[in-house]
Structure formats: structure tokens, C-alpha cells
């Protein structure tokens, strides 16, 4: 089957038309406008390509999903989370989990070269698109701070009651997992059931993520995005999933 080439005004083809080799590739071209990205994510499609390539659009089958109720931290991570929770009421806790205080820095860290990887899919154009989505209140970061330094985190897209995870990074062991645990608590409190993880990896599976048939995934997101989105604000998350809004200046040591 020939890969469809999208002009700016061309709608996406049905996700059932995605190729089997490479698995999930649906189309190429178009742009990264907010309208295009919203249409993509609302239909189970995401962009993934390298610098110098055209924009490639994917909808793999099955789709990796973390059901918030199935989040499964390891014994050591649970122990660390309990320790952080005990200390979070201190005047200046050593570890804080924050929302949207350093979105650009989180994206930049996620895009940085990693051992064993030749390049990054988070191209300059993708970073610009995410920053625009963040300015529009749709893209968000969850950040783990240790002793006033950004130690790890993640970012993703929030549409209604659906969260689409994009990427994670860590400078300190388990820092990104701590951010994920706090995100899960926040989303569960807001009635969000699923986090889209896009592609299957052992790392995600170890945390409770599972493959879901694409048809079921698309059906779920179309219902979920019709619901109200969580009340995202810049501030601090606690271990129970409550977001405490605060100016960035009051959070920095």
C-alpha cells in the first residue's frame, strides 16, 4: 500500500489503513499546527520522526497504555515514595514534585542525546510545537526536584480525561518514576483512567503498562476527551494527587 502524503488541508486516513511494515505508519507530511496535532491525538495518531525526515504519523496496533489503576511501582520505588510522602509537609522538603514550573527544560532534557541512541525524535520543530501547546494550556510537565535541582521528569498532552505521555528523562535514579507516580495519583483524582504510552517497552511494562487493541484504544480516547480536563496549574503535587498552585518563585530554594 502506498503511504498517503498529507497536504495542510488533507484529513488523516482511517487508522485501520496504517501499514504493517513498518508497523503503525499511517501517513507523512502536513504540519505540526495545534489544529493538526489535536486532530491526530483525538484519533489515536501521533507524530514520530527524526531530523531531516518528513513528518511521519503513526497509529500502532496494539497500543501501549498505562491504566492508572494498574500502576505497579517496584518495592524499592514504593519505599522511596513513602519516604518522600513523609517529608513533603516539611517547610523545605528535600524532594518536591512540581507541575509546569520548567516545561521547556523538561522537553530539552528529554530531547538530549542518550547512550545507545543515534539521535532524537524530539526534533526542533517538535519542541516548538510542544511549547506552543504548553502556552495553550494543553501540554504539561511533571518534574521531580531534589535539593532545588531538576532531577527528572516527564511531559505529555492533556485532552479531556485522557493523558498522552510523550517522554521522560532522569538525572538521578528513579526521579522520572517518582514524577510518574505523582502524575498517576493526580490523574486518578481527576477521573483520568488511561495514560497513552504509544509504544511497547519493557520499562513501561515493568510499571504496569499493557498493550491494548487499537480499536479499543481509539474508542476509549474518543469518549475520554469529551470529558473535563484536570485543573492543571503551576505548583506542587503531593502524594495524594492534590495540586497546590504556587508561583514558581515560592517553590525555588
Swiss-Prot record:
Report the enzyme's class at the first EC level: transferase
Q: State which Enzyme Commission number(s) the record gives.
A: 2.3.2.6
Q: Which PANTHER family match?
A: LEUCYL/PHENYLALANYL-TRNA--PROTEIN TRANSFERASE, LEUCYL_PHENYLALANYL-TRNA--PROTEIN TRANSFERASE
Which NCBIfam families is this protein grouped with? aat
Query: Keywords assigned by UniProt?
Result: Acyltransferase, Cytoplasm, Transferase
Q: Which SUPFAM superfamilies match?
A: Acyl-CoA N-acyltransferases (Nat)
Main function: Functions in the N-end rule pathway of protein degradation where it conjugates Leu, Phe and, less efficiently, Met from aminoacyl-tRNAs to the N-termini of proteins containing an N-terminal arginine or lysine.
- Which family is this sequence assigned to? Belongs to the L/F-transferase family.
Q: Report one GO cellular component.
A: cytoplasm
Q: Which HAMAP family match?
A: Leu_Phe_trans (MF_00688)
Q: Name one GO molecular function term.
A: leucyl-tRNA--protein transferase activity
Q: Which InterPro entries match?
A: Acyl_CoA_acyltransferase (IPR016181), Leu/Phe-tRNA_Trfase (IPR004616), Leu/Phe-tRNA_Trfase_C (IPR042203), Leu/Phe-tRNA_Trfase_N (IPR042221)
Listed name of the protein: Leucyl/phenylalanyl-tRNA--protein transferase
* Gene Ontology terms describing biological process: protein catabolic process
Top-level taxonomic group: Bacteria
Q: From the UniProt record, list the reaction(s) this protein catalyses.
A: N-terminal L-lysyl-[protein] + L-leucyl-tRNA(Leu) = N-terminal L-leucyl-L-lysyl-[protein] + tRNA(Leu) + H(+); N-terminal L-arginyl-[protein] + L-leucyl-tRNA(Leu) = N-terminal L-leucyl-L-arginyl-[protein] + tRNA(Leu) + H(+); L-phenylalanyl-tRNA(Phe) + an N-terminal L-alpha-aminoacyl-[protein] = an N-terminal L-phenylalanyl-L-alpha-aminoacyl-[protein] + tRNA(Phe)
The protein's location, in the record's own words, is:
Cytoplasm
